[in-house]
Amino acid sequence: MNWLTNVVRPKIRNILKRETPDNLWIKCPDTGQLVFYKDVESNQFVIPGSNYHMRMSADARLKSIFDNETWYDVALPEVTADPLKFRDERKYVDRIRDARAKTGLHDSVKVGFGRLEGSAVVVAVQDFDFMGGSLGMAAGEAIVRGLELAVEKRCPFIVFAASGGARMQEGVLSLMQLPRTTVAVQMLREARQPYIVVLTNPTTGGVTASYAMLGDVQIAEPGALIGFAGARVIEQTIREKLPDGFQRAEYLRDHGMIDLVVHRHELRPTLARVCRLLTKAPEMIEQEPEPSAPVPPDEPDEPAATQEAPPAAPAAPPA
């Protein structure tokens, strides 16, 4: 009997055992509730019930914004992967390699060109899963390139910010992206095109000292953490207890730091409405057939799927 119990039964269990995916369930960070992953995915990564906004990948974010989930990937300039030959506990090049394998992205920012309710827009998305969405040379070049394309196409530029700050492994070369992106935003302003920022959870550090807080319209997702320094650092500096909800989206809206807090389900129509107001474009008529995908800068034909847009654009601000 012991042989049947201790040997045969476990072997049968192993043969019949069904493998369970690691991401089958998601635990809500707010309530601790376990939710089926597919339910969260189909709900734009908003936890049903608690309405907690989970992080979205760059591709999922772009799909949620562009018409027909179709856009052109904007070709981005190549940069030196490890200019300082930086190493801490691990080599910087190894960290980049792991982040690329994990996310499928070249760096923390992805830029797409497409249509939002019929109007052409350029959208840049920071992916927090790529080294905390940190801002390095590649990410800075991506933001600048997206702004240049918006100037060239004379259309709005929308950026979804999600970052822990500057990338320390690139030192001052990372910090240089703060003034470079600021100058590029000014180029868009001089072209009289809208610049819209959507602050997601979290948006902290150096990006809040540059392009993430320069929008003509500042929008945030509910509950997003937004700030330059951490709450504990501020409390230790001023030696005072911070109020409840400090650095959260709702607190910043109530104190005039941002314009709107918009639920993710309402984000696409809100962005389309803001773009129409700022560009004085007519509203798309619902009875019209589905809008076609945008024509890339140098190709008159319609795309069948996501493609790369040619990189021709004005010169970037000097490094």
UniProtKB/Swiss-Prot annotation:
Cellular component GO terms held in the UniProt record: acetate CoA-transferase complex
Known pathway: Lipid metabolism; malonyl-CoA biosynthesis; malonyl-CoA from acetyl-CoA: step 1/1
Catalytic activity, reaction form: N(6)-carboxybiotinyl-L-lysyl-[protein] + acetyl-CoA = N(6)-biotinyl-L-lysyl-[protein] + malonyl-CoA
Single GO term (MF): carboxyl- or carbamoyltransferase activity
EC number: 2.1.3.15
The UniProt record lists the keyword Transmembrane: no
Entry keyword annotation includes Protein biosynthesis: no
Pfam families found in the cross-reference section: Carboxyl_trans
Disulfide bond positions: none
Top enzyme category: transferase
GO biological process: fatty acid biosynthetic process; malonyl-CoA biosynthetic process
The family this protein is said to belong to: Belongs to the AccD/PCCB family.
Subunit structure: Acetyl-CoA carboxylase is a heterohexamer composed of biotin carboxyl carrier protein (AccB), biotin carboxylase (AccC) and two subunits each of ACCase subunit alpha (AccA) and ACCase subunit beta (AccD).
Protein task: Component of the acetyl coenzyme A carboxylase (ACC) complex. Biotin carboxylase (BC) catalyzes the carboxylation of biotin on its carrier protein (BCCP) and then the CO(2) group is transferred by the transcarboxylase to acetyl-CoA to form malonyl-CoA.
Protein name (record): Acetyl-coenzyme A carboxylase carboxyl transferase subunit beta
